[in-house]
């Protein structure tokens, strides 16, 4: 989601599950 780009917390999440999953 676009919110992920503005959410620093999502960056850590992406590190765990993968960017494609986090930014889906």
UniProtKB/Swiss-Prot annotation:
Disulfide bonds: 4-10
UniProt keyword Metal-binding, yes or no: yes
Location of the protein in the cell: Secreted
One GO cellular component term: extracellular region
Major subcellular location class: secreted
Annotated binding of Ca(2+) 3, by residue: 5, 11
Alphabetized UniProt keyword annotations: Biomineralization, Calcium, Disulfide bond, Extinct organism protein, Gamma-carboxyglutamic acid, Hormone, Metal-binding, Secreted
Molecular function terms from GO: calcium ion binding; hormone activity; hydroxyapatite binding; structural constituent of bone
Modified positions (4-carboxyglutamate) in chain numbering: 2, 5
Family to which this protein belongs: Belongs to the osteocalcin/matrix Gla protein family.
Protein name, as recorded: Osteocalcin
Species name: Homo sapiens neanderthalensis
Gene this chain is encoded by: BGLAP
């Amino acid at each position: 989601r676009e919110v992920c780009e503005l959410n620093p917390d999502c960056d850590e999440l992406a590190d765990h599950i993968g960017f494609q999953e986090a930014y889906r």
